[in-house]
Amino acid sequence: MTTGAGRRLMLVAVVLATAAGCASYSAELRAGKRGEREAGLATYYSPRLAGHKTASGERYDPKQFTAAHPVIPFGTHVQVTRTDGTNRAVIVRVNDRCKGGRKIIDVSESAARQLDMLRVGIVPVELEVMAPPP
C-alpha cells in the first residue's frame, strides 16, 4: 500500500519529468522565431487519417503541405530537410501536434512524397523556421 508521502513523491517525480521534457524546446522555437533549427526524425501521417481533425481544428488533407510538431505555433512555415545525404527539402505549415522526443515532426503525405520518404517511413531531418505564424 502506498502512503500519502509516497504518492506525493511519485506525483512530484512525474511533474518534474514532464517539465524536463518540455524544457528541451527553446523559447525561440516555441515562439516560431525565424531561423530557429531542430534536428531529429520525421515520419508521415497514415492515409487513414485523411479528413480527421487536427489539433488546430483543420481537417487533415494529405494533398496539402502540412505537419505536426510538439511546440511550434500553428501557422508557422518550416523547412524540413533530409540529413541522410539526399538533401531533399520541403516547406510545410504546422497545423497539428505530435508527441516529440526523437521524432520531431509528422508530415503530410504530399510532403513525405516530396521528401522521398514514403517507402522508408522515417528519416533524419533538420527543421528550420522560415516564417512565423501570421
Over which residues does each language-model region extend?
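Bacterial N-terminal signal peptides that target proteins for export
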Residues: M1-M10
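Secreted/periplasmic proteins
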Residues: T2-T3, T18-P134
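Bacterial N-terminal signal peptides
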Residues: M10-A20
